[in-house]
Amino acid sequence: MNKFKYTLAIIKPDILVKQNQNVDKIINKIESKFIIHQRKQIKLSLEEAEQFYKDHRGKFFYERLISFMTRGDIIPLILSDKSLEINNNNNNNNNNTSIKPWRDFIGPTHRDKAREQIGCLRGEYGTSDTRNAFHGSGSEEEAIDEINFFFPHFLENNKK
């Protein structure tokens, strides 16, 4: 049985507001390791941001996160790790997920830890723990929910 191979990534508003010239460079970096299956640029409404981050409601950073995520455009992307395509063709690797490779690629949530990790995107582009430039699904269940949130028909149209 194949594991879920997709993950949801988000390029957050800090990239689009303050570093817009870097978007193409960032997309190229992403495409060096991941296949982009879907992408769009949108601005979340307050209600959409509250729905997307409902699991964080009540946490100390929730209001700051909602305010930040609604201040400008974001780019949600559906990704799969390019190495999965190779591994799936060569053997039955049990690590058939893009979630961990994407989270490793973007690096730790916390800015200072991200800056210590050479080559991670958050270390290069993040400016604070909230304005950390990128989002990555934390689990298969989260990835499914998040992909359905931004791309409601993708998973049903891409069943294998």
Swiss-Prot record:
Natural source organism = Dictyostelium discoideum
Q: What is its EC number?
A: 2.7.4.6
Q: Does Metal-binding show up as a keyword for this record?
A: yes
Q: What class of enzyme is it?
A: transferase
One Pfam family in the UniProt entry: NDK
User: Which catalytic residues are annotated?
Assistant: H135 (pros-phosphohistidine intermediate)
Is Iron among the key words of this record? no
Q: What name does the UniProt record give this protein?
A: Probable nucleoside diphosphate kinase DDB_G0292928
Q: Which GO terms describe its biological process?
A: nucleotide metabolic process
Keyword vocabulary terms for this entry? ATP-binding, Kinase, Magnesium, Metal-binding, Nucleotide metabolism, Nucleotide-binding, Phosphoprotein, Transferase
One function term, GO molecular function aspect: nucleoside diphosphate kinase activity
Q: Which residues bind ATP?
A: K12, F61, R103, T109, R122, N132
Cofactor field: Mg(2+)
Q: Which InterPro entries match?
A: NDK-like_dom (IPR034907), NDK-like_dom_sf (IPR036850)
- Reaction equation(s) it catalyzes: a 2'-deoxyribonucleoside 5'-diphosphate + ATP = a 2'-deoxyribonucleoside 5'-triphosphate + ADP; a ribonucleoside 5'-diphosphate + ATP = a ribonucleoside 5'-triphosphate + ADP
Q: What family name appears in the similarity comment?
A: Belongs to the NDK family.
